[in-house]
UniProtKB/Swiss-Prot annotation:
Gene3D superfamilies xrefs: Glycosidases (3.20.20.80)
Record's protein name: Myrosinase MA1
Chief site of localization: other
SUPFAM superfamilies, A to Z: (Trans)glycosidases
Naturally occurring in which organism (per UniProt): Sinapis alba
Amino acid sequence: DEEITCQENLPFTCGNTDALNSSSFSSDFIFGVASSAYQIEGTIGRGLNIWDGFTHRYPNKSGPDHGNGDTTCDSFSYWQKDIDVLDELNATGYRFSIAWSRIIPRGKRSRGVNEKGIDYYHGLISGLIKKGITPFVTLFHWDLPQTLQDEYEGFLDPQIIDDFKDYADLCFEEFGDSVKYWLTINQLYSVPTRGYGSALDAPGRCSPTVDPSCYAGNSSTEPYIVAHHQLLAHAKVVDLYRKNYTHQGGKIGPTMITRWFLPYNDTDRHSIAATERMKEFFLGWFMGPLTNGTYPQIMIDTVGERLPSFSPEESNLVKGSYDFLGLNYYFTQYAQPSPNPVNSTNHTAMMDAGAKLTYINASGHYIGPLFEKDKADSTDNIYYYPKGIYSVMDYFKNKYYNPLIYVTENGISTPGDENRNQSMLDYTRIDYLCSHLCFLNKVIKEKDVNVKGYLAWALGDNYEFNKGFTVRFGLSYIDWNNVTDRDLKKSGQWYQSFISP
């Protein structure tokens, strides 16, 4: 077998598309980009969702600039421009999400369907297919109809399971003949921990001692309940698809946010143990039920009665409820032991892993190049680790029975206060993307991991959760004073030549 060499740190030379390009991958491998509804569409023509509610109620949490998704890049009006970018990239895949409140404005299908919203997605999907671009469609990318949050606190209540199923049923009915890749819920870990634990995300529930501005919540218990209902809602939808829609010939699965974890001190058994706990609490929390029908034993032991349990029927429903996994990967962290003050009033579910996470290890070594600079405090800077994508893919193959995998997000931001010229010359993004693609190619070739596609985040600059417009993630540039155009940045031109060498 050929030995593939990938650099772990700067300066990267993988930007040379003569050496690394799409022909390094199998001929059926899909390359493209990703987006989500709240971040790109704008509010025109849809019902309110919890990100509308959250960003207006807590503008300081929506971004340092108080930015929100009210208009953003207005892809509701300019979706054809999005397709033009994909066409220019020669992309063969595009991941986007359907806004639940655009097609069912009041959350429950029984309250009526918005035909104009359905027409919007029909237009987008057929436009993609005309250009030979495969749609990857996310049903839920965090933008729950506000009515369902108001009525029963959304995923905190089991009522969500049937409402989500009815919404998915409508999507399969309308779009299933054209859509062959469905993603149920984006980043299963995120809404429970960020929406109901730290309250950094919508709906913004937490214990009063965690953040006094939270309108209600319990950061120690609610994340586990929300995660449990997400798993059941996901599984119910997969079951529906398999019972009623297999004739459409598509595949369905969840999206996981992944990280890799390394010991803060690799000679210290406590750091090593903390690292293993993080893998179970971050990945196993969802992959345990999805593969074995049960939560990891370490979680059962640690969380105790705060962790819901599955009935035998539920366990069977959740177990094996995916045809493929969408894996998002951005960075890796060092783990060291940290106390878990279960009985304190400011306890959160995220403390249960008993780990503190950093980007610098015991010997003062940074894990890799700068990912994102923290304006307020440089000790909060994030650093990235391209080899982490290799480790994550290898881990999923070995621990979770060699699943079919699509990388559904991978990308890096640049500062939003750069001028247009600086933003267009985004060489840091080329470094990030090419170094991860090198390690992705390496793990496929060396470990025979079943990865069949890579979708970079993001198609264009957009509203970033918690950051507003203070960062840019796009491979194409959007001028916030005139959002009609999307211009390929250097990284977009690089990706274009990577896809079509």
